[in-house]
Each structure stands twice: as structure tokens, then as C-alpha cells.
Amino acid sequence: MWIQIVDGIVIAPLLETALYQMFIFWILKLIPGMEKYNKSIIFISAIIFGLSHNFSYIYILYACIMGFVFAYSYWTYTRKYENGHTKFPPFWIVWCIHVLHNIVVFFIKNL
């Protein structure tokens, strides 16, 4: 049971932040001209994140919304990090947000 808890609360957000925010932002910005379309990148990231959580239609919708929160946070903190307004890399900030979200969900589901 503890392995599942650690996996769901710590490891999954680590991998998902790397894949669905950091990698997707990086790969889409390689497309010429795409760097101007941050809103599109945020939505693409959110949709892919949501679709990867395909337990049910409602869960996909909820995961898309959370994916939007994570992607928007990643974009926001990337800009702040690049401008020197924060010393924390956006990856770790989004990972912390995701971990806190998963902790709250875990306690709600298991109370």
C-alpha cells in the first residue's frame, strides 16, 4: 500500500510534470512560429494530460482542467524564472503543486 501511495503522490507527478509540461512545452516550441502561441501550447498540454487519465469521461474532463492548471503554472513560472523573478525552476514548482493536489485527493478519497 505504501508503494502505491508514494507512487501516486510523489513519482507520478514527477514523471507527469516532465512529460506533460516540460517535454510538451519544449517540443512544441521547436515548431517554427509556435513560441508565439503559448495559449495553444497550454491547451494542448492540458488535453494530452487529461486524455492520459482515461478512467472515465468525467475523470478525463477533470484531468484536463487540472492539466490546464499545471500547464498554465508551468508557463507562468517559466517566464518568472527566465526573468529572474523566482529562483525556483518551474519544473519543481509545478511538481509541488501536483503533489499537493494528489495529497488532497488522496485524503478526500480515503476519509
Residue ranges and their predicted role:
Residues I5-L111:
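Transmembrane helix-loop-helix hairpins at the membrane interface
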